[in-house]
Design a protein with these regions (language model features):
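Short connector loops at helix/strand junctions that flank enzyme active sites
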Residues: 15, 40-42, 47, 98-102
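Conserved Nudix-box catalytic region and its N-terminal flanking loop in Nudix hydrolases
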Residues: 28-69
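Conserved N-terminal beta-strand and adjoining loop/helix that marks the start
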Residues: 7-30, 102-103
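Short, charged/polar surface micro-motifs in flexible loops or helix N-caps
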Residues: 23-29, 37, 108-113
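Short acidic, low-complexity intrinsically disordered linear motifs used
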Residues: 1-7
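Charged phosphate-binding loop/patch that engages nucleotide di/tri-phosphates or the phosphate backbone
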Residues: 141-154
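Unchanged
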Residues: 52-82, 86-142
């Protein structure tokens, strides 16, 4: 059963998104650089993620689908991949109304997979805790803050 808050958010045409903080066994974090032709934040580094579609049964289903579409990495619930929610953020318009929300999930991999980028992205890189700082000003807004939140909790 949906909560009142969920019903209210859905009735306002709120867009729902998921993002994955993908971590390999070396404790490196995967970021993708958006292709230059992308209107919103083209050329910026960000997480794997996207919209939750009507066909997705849950945010985790959307996350698994987006990871496969954007990186070629296939995850299933049968495998030993840890997927846990880190944070959920509401995005507001100028009137303070919620227009979208993003759920951020940590995805811990058992191996360092081959990444096959979609055409939405031009590059990818696995970053350790120190090297990620060099991209701080080249990231999509909030990405670096979410990364800091991850490291504070892990």
């Amino acid at each position: 059963m949906k909560s009142l808050k969920e019903i209210i958010l859905e009735s306002k045409n709120v867009h729902h998104y998921v993002d994955a903080i993908i971590i390999n066994p070396d404790n490196e974090l995967l970021l993708l650089q958006r292709a230059g032709y992308i209107k919103q934040f083209g050329g910026k580094w960000g997480f794997v993620g996207g919209s939750i579609d009507n066909k997705d049964k849950s945010p985790k289903d959307a996350l698994i689908r987006e990871i496969k579409e954007e990186t070629g990495i296939e995850l299933t619930f049968n495998e030993n991949h840890a997927i846990k929610q880190l944070y959920k953020k509401n995005h507001l318009d100028n009137d303070g109304e919620v227009v979208s929300d993003t759920e951020y999930f940590i995805v811990e991999l058992e191996s360092k997979p081959e990444v096959k980028l979609s055409r939405e992205h031009s590059r990818y890189k696995w970053f350790d805790r120190n090297s990620i700082k060099e991209k701080q000003n080249k990231c999509v807004p909030d990405v670096f803050n979410i990364i800091q939140r991850y490291y504070e909790n892990n």
